[in-house]
């Protein structure tokens, strides 16, 4: 994990990032979702787009391939992590904006002269969302100190059922659990708890850098937030793996599940199905892996 921020640290001063932005909207786009589309489908994906001087990972080529795949998807909302690269965001936005007219972020943006960058959190949506509140974590370590990591809470409606969406990216797991635990507590104390409303589900998604196999830390994460997880459908069970991934090949890291879509106040949710989404496309000679992470998706049916 430490290697992924090597170029990040070198490029911070030259990284130009957009402020919170919502694209222009055509009246016809307010017709979404159609009456027969009952389920809300959310994708959360760490796309590994470090600042634009990170030539090693061919951000522009990967961004074009990512955009092509997502543009033909049926996701309602896409939550990106590590969308640091302005040029990559421009490419993705240009392709997606017809089907995903609403963009939010990058969250915790910095001025052009800052030594820090944004949180890398960026949201594309087919439906309008209201930004309720965002936070920057009080503590971080290592290269995460150069990123304004934090979380954002947005609120939307799906067939008149209100829901809240929290997006986050927690401290890299190269450093102690204590930092991640404090950041998770900040999400609970500053977003989940104060903005909780009766009958409004809270959907919490992102890269938590907390391995499902580390039972003590995983259970603590859920307990602190008062959140629920669930089983994954499908064959793939890991969101980070060096198996069959050219970007992480050679790292020799064990496969891990560290990305989640969690629920809180879930009484209005009839069902949820979670799945690891392995999204690939050709972007260069012998290159199909689009990120060092697999994505995670959730299909949510509300009680109507």
Predicted regions and their residues:
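N-terminal, active-site-proximal structural segment of metallo-dependent hydrolase catalytic domains
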Residues: 2-95, 110-118, 299-304
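Metal-dependent phosphoester-hydrolase catalytic domains
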Residues: 18-32, 192-202, 210-304
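Structured beta-strand-rich core segments of catalytic domains in phosphoester-bond hydrolases
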Residues: 25-34, 59, 77, 81-170, ...
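Residues that flank catalytic or metal-binding motifs in active/ligand-binding sites
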Residues: 38-41, 117-120, 148-152, 161, ...
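Active-site beta-strand/loop signature of hydrolases that rely on acidic residues for catalysis
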Residues: 40-47, 66-92, 124, 154, ...
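Short, solvent-exposed loop/turn segments at secondary-structure junctions
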Residues: 47-50, 85-86, 110, 127-130, ...
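Short, well-ordered secondary-structure micro-motifs
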Residues: 55, 98, 115, 177-178, ...
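Alpha-helical scaffold elements lining the catalytic groove of polysaccharide deacetylases
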Residues: 57-58, 64, 176-192
């Amino acid at each position: 994990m430490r290697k992924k921020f090597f170029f990040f640290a070198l490029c911070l001063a030259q990284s130009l990032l957009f402020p919170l932005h919502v694209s222009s909207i055509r009246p016809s786009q307010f017709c979404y979702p159609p009456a027969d589309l009952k389920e809300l489908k959310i994708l959360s994906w760490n796309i590994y787009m470090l600042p634009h001087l990170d030539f090693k990972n061919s951000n522009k080529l990967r961004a074009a391939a990512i955009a092509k795949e997502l543009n033909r998807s049926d996701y309602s909302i896409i939550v990106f992590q590590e969308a640091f690269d302005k040029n990559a965001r421009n490419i993705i936005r240009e392709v997606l904006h017809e089907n995903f007219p609403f963009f939010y972020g990058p969250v915790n943006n910095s001025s052009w002269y800052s030594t820090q960058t944004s949180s890398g959190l960026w949201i594309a949506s087919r439906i309008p969302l209201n930004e309720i509140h965002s936070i920057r974590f009080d503590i971080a370590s290592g290269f995460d100190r150069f990123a304004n990591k934090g979380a954002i809470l947005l609120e939307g409606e799906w067939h008149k059922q209100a829901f809240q969406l929290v997006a986050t990216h927690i401290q890299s797991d190269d450093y102690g659990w204590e930092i991640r635990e404090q950041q998770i507590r900040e999400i609970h104390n500053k977003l989940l708890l104060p903005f909780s409303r009766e009958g409004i589900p809270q959907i919490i998604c992102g890269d938590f850098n907390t391995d499902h196999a580390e039972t003590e830390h995983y259970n603590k994460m859920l307990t602190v937030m008062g959140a629920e997880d669930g089983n994954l459908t499908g064959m793939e069970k890991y969101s980070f793996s060096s198996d069959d991934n050219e970007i992480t090949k050679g790292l020799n890291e064990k496969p891990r599940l560290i990305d989640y879509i969690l629920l809180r106040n879930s009484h209005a949710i009839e069902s949820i199905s979670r799945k690891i989404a392995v999204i690939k496309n050709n972007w260069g000679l012998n290159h199909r892996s689009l990120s060092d992470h697999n994505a995670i998706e959730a299909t949510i049916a509300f009680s109507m």
